[in-house]
Amino acid sequence: MLITKISPAVKTEGRYNVFVDGKYSFSLDEVQLAALTIKKGDELDEQQLDQLKSESSFGKNYIRALDLVSRRPRSQREIRDYAFRKQWTKANTDRVIERLLERGYLNDAKFAEIFVRSRANLRNYSTRRMKLELQKKGISSDIIDQVLSESDDFDENVALKNLIAKKQNRYDDEQKLIAYLARQGFNYDSIRMALNQQKSGTIDDE
């Protein structure tokens, strides 16, 4: 088999289409093209062609992963879940994850810090819910515990008081409010204490 043509892709800047025996076979980005040193006129056997096609798939997968992490921080689990849905090969998925880690685009500890900060400021999450949400994202228990213990942004008592102030008018029955707060992951004793402070006018006192 012979590489008969290498030409710039029309729709994707920086990517090149490679033709084998006169037919389109695969595409590579300019970095891959330079690294692999392939050129028009090169002869390929089946194994070499398969390897080049695998590199093509890896390059596309990596660019897609870069696009995902550029939109917002991602955990390793999120990238793996996306790769599974899109049916990437395990080998390519592992390579993509490894390269993202090497280049600092994936960091579960930083992801957890940003997640905690955003939920603390906007969502009034309980510690329990914060942990559950981070676990769903694939963050290890050690990282979760460390981030929560070191965070200056997260205070469960403040989150609980804020949520009471926000939701109290919606629940004219205190027991329903307590049940709602419990479903959000706050424990009964903390809920009772916060409600008693609110009734006595000390909800903002520390």
Q: Each predicted region: which residue ranges?
A:
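An alpha-helical, amphipathic repeat domain used for nucleic-acid recognition
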Residues: M1-E206
